[in-house]
């Protein structure tokens, strides 16, 4: 079994390398038209440059997974701004995509928690479609629309989960099929459990991203890992790639939903024990605060387990 690991957005080891530099609408609205355009271009350019820096860092450390920042392009979905961010940066987007393909990286996006399809408000669904389209446009500009995925949560319950899930069934129809085909769903830490999210994934043919930390914080009484994991694998069968699992650990016993700086191996070991009988490859996205540093430390700790072998900076051959 081969387990690969990746991190989110930026490498904390790198100096001043955030790919999510912001330009608020409040600031933008105070600028002249030309100044506003220049600010959009300048901020996006900086974020694309730092995305490249972060990718080179991952490659140099042999880390095979990476999640792009959703904030690469400022104000891309703001109703009063929405601008053509692809044309001025065709070269930069293609350079990123070429680098990803050349080194065989697995990449993804994670639109924010407001991108959901369970709301009773049509405007929320419209905004979700706009946001998913924005992320797809970036994948398309990188020529990665056949490789990358966009991961979101099911959404809110609004006091009635059954009705909310029925709205999901209807609202998701507004998402163009080619964009929905690049979508995954993840269980969350407060509302939709692993089993509930799996049910939606199986119904709609959407791959299931299992978040172990969320599962611990928001668990069905009868949800055994031994039952969840085989079903998770099944949702990825048609993709031809391993499933993805999110890894993090609680900041403290009281702050169980907050992410710690690193990943506590004792917290995640039950998951690895449950995965062992499956005998399948898995990719893991580290969601700890220290990102790349947390990843490298966890990989080192896991590879020290007798029988395991580290075969790359972010890859372990796990003893069957």
Swiss-Prot record:
Superkingdom field: Bacteria
GO molecular function: endonuclease activity
Keyword DNA repair on entry: yes
Top-rank EC class of the record's enzyme: hydrolase
Keywords attached to this entry: DNA damage, DNA excision, DNA repair, Endonuclease, Hydrolase, Nuclease
A biological process term (GO) from this entry: response to UV
Known EC number: 3.-.-.-
Keyword Nuclease: yes
Alphabetized InterPro entries for the sequence: UvdE, UvdE_bac, Xyl_isomerase-like_sf
PANTHER family: UV-DAMAGE ENDONUCLEASE
Function (record text): Component in a DNA repair pathway. Removal of UV LIGHT damaged nucleotides. Recognizes pyrimidine dimers and cleave a phosphodiester bond immediately 5' to the lesion.
UniProt similarity note: Belongs to the uve1/UvsE family.
Protein's name according to its UniProt entry: UV DNA damage endonuclease
């Amino acid at each position: 079994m081969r387990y690969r690991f990746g991190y989110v957005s930026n490498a904390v080891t790198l100096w001043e390398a955030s790919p999510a530099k912001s330009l608020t609408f409040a600031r933008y609205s105070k600028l002249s038209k030309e100044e506003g355009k220049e600010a959009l271009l300048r901020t996006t350019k900086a974020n694309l440059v730092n995305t490249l820096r972060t990718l080179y860092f991952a490659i140099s450390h042999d880390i095979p997974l990476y999640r792009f920042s959703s904030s690469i392009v400022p104000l891309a979905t703001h109703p009063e701004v929405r601008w053509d961010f692809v044309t001025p940066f065709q070269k930069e987007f293609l350079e990123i995509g070429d680098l990803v393909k050349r080194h065989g990286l697995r990449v993804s996006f994670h639109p924010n928690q407001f991108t959901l399809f369970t709301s009773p408000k049509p405007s929320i669904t419209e905004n979700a479609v706009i946001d998913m389209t924005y992320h797809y446009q970036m994948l398309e500009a990188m020529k990665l629309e056949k490789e990358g995925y966009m991961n979101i949560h099911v959404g809110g319950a609004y006091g009635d989960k059954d009705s909310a899930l029925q709205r999901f069934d209807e609202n998701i129809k507004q998402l163009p099929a080619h964009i929905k085909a690049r979508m995954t769903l993840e269980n969350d830490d407060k509302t939709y459990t692993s089993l509930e999210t799996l049910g939606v994934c199986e119904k709609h043919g959407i791959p299931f991203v299992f978040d172990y930390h969320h599962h611990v914080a928001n668990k069905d009484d009868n949800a055994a890992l031994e039952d969840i994991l085989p079903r998770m694998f099944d949702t990825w069968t048609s993709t031809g790639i391993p499933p993805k699992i999110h890894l993090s650990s609680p900041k403290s016993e009281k702050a169980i939903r907050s992410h710690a700086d690193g990943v506590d191996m004792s917290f995640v070991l039950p998951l690895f024990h449950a995965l062992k009988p499956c005998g399948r490859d898995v990719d893991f996205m580290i969601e700890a605060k220290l990102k790349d540093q947390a990843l490298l430390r966890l990989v080192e700790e896991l590879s020290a387990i007798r029988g395991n072998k580290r075969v790359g900076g972010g890859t372990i051959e796990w003893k069957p």
